[in-house]
Amino acid sequence: LAAGQNHPSFGMRIKNPTPSLDDRYYVEHSNQHVGQGCLSGSENSAAIGGWRFTGLKLCRATALSESISKDLLPFLTSIQPKRMSDSYDTIIIGAGMSGLAAGIRLAHFDQRVCILERHYTIGGLNSFYRMGGRDYDVGLHAMTNYARKGTKKGPLAKLIRQLRFSWEDFKLAEQIGSSIRFPGVELDFNNDIELLESEIQKNFPTQIDGFRNLCDSLLDYSDMDGDDPRFMQSAREVVSSHITDRLLVEMLICPLMWYGNAREDDMDFGQFCIMFRACYLEGFGRPYKGVRVILKNLVKRFRGLGGELKLRSGVSKIHTDRGVATGVVLDDGTELEGKRILSSAGSIETLRLCDDVTQPEVAKAGKLSFIESISVLDRQPSDFDFDRTIVFYNDSDTFHWKRPEDQLCDARTGVICSPNNYIYDSEEGKLPDGVIRITTLANHDRWCALPENKYRAAKIEQYDASVASSVRFMPDFRRYVIDTDVFTPKTIRRFTWHDNGAVYGAPDKQLDGTTHLPNVFLCGTDQGFVGIVGAIVSGISMANRHCLVGN
């Protein structure tokens, strides 16, 4: 059939809006999209949208797959429910930051790459949505590892170089300044370590030499493969060997656990070093338009290099044969073949997908999950004398980093973030609304066990509790609130698929990204790097290490 020609029997119309893209065709029936692909097939057997049927001369889809219109079904002489198979150099599970970054890196080297995402949107936990006429960011308090334009070293410079972005593609604004607030004492810090040093000199004068010694003992990023024997040491023990004041130890470790620790109570020293550099030595930044500009740039680059992104395409199984992965099966039955698989789904979650694993060790899953209470204000936070970018607070001298077992949430400690309090360019101006975001620890199982009516009521109750806790450490903003939203561990579970809604994944990281299968690898939180920059660097590093060998 020629473009635009109607099928003489069934009224089928073929359109070709983009003939330059491999002569890819869209096919419609009764003005409903049926599928797309390259024109092919025979008089008696053809396929479109991944569905094979006989008696029609149609086209074979090679990219996006759509369900066949119900209006079309009566006209088909027969349908075989088995989906057609496509083959890729690398299949990536998850369109979060790490998956997208890995896809870009591989597509640069002309690999045929397909990213599969279960949901209707990209980003995983670091995403965004629109509600009530307002845009909301999810996950992005700040991008850690801030670096100024032209910097040659560090994770941010690495990702810009390896993904071939420019500094203007992210255009990060620096934080105004953040604080660690415990009862009776406060430490301010910004993107210059000298401020934190001066704060420690002022509040803990006997500890300043110990703090400097701690800085000198940090593992370098080049040591983050886990081979250094100090990597798995207790962070509390190592820090306490340099700093003898227990309160200062608790204060320094608080932000680092909040922004990147999957282990309860303590932290691997290697992970402590990663987060210490990310938060204290490099600092925080944010694009004016938030996480959406980061995701937009990643997707645009990936697709521009020929990568395939399939949304609403969850993976139900990883096929194995003789100890090697051969491909995946999607939730709708589509089979895709791949030479290798890179998964950001999590270590336990990935093992569960493999058809050669009967029961992964679910006890190793992470337990730490959060709720986040978002308040939209009728004024800027600076209007009521709140200029902090982020406040990490704790209401006692001991920092408790553990899932609350007997309640929905633990509001004794939390994080207050205002995206308004960054140094944006004058041409960008101020954000349209004042926003305060408050994060507290939560129990995934208790939230998920609530019936719908009690779940909605609990969101209101816990919003009130988290705000009431936070205003002990910042000016009271409750009379300025004009809109709210709350996301819970149930939300996190839905959009990340992590067991227990674990924000930072499993406590035991697989730093080399390997699994029990020689061609299935991990990237993202369970590989070891967390946060936006960490996730992107994880995707790049695992792609370089495992997927470009011999390329």
Where are these regions (language model features)?
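C-terminal segments that line or cap access tunnels to active or ligand-binding sites in enzymes
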Residues: 379-487
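A conserved FAD-binding loop/helix module that cradles the flavin
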Residues: 525-546
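A glycine-rich dinucleotide-binding beta-alpha-beta segment and adjacent secondary-structure elements
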Residues: 249-259, 415-416, 472-529
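Helical element adjacent to the flavin cofactor pocket in flavoenzyme catalytic cores
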Residues: 275-325
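Rossmann-like flavin
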Residues: 182-267
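Mid-domain catalytic core of redox enzymes
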Residues: 31, 316-430
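N-terminal glycine-rich phosphate/pyrophosphate-binding loop and immediately adjacent elements
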Residues: 83-209
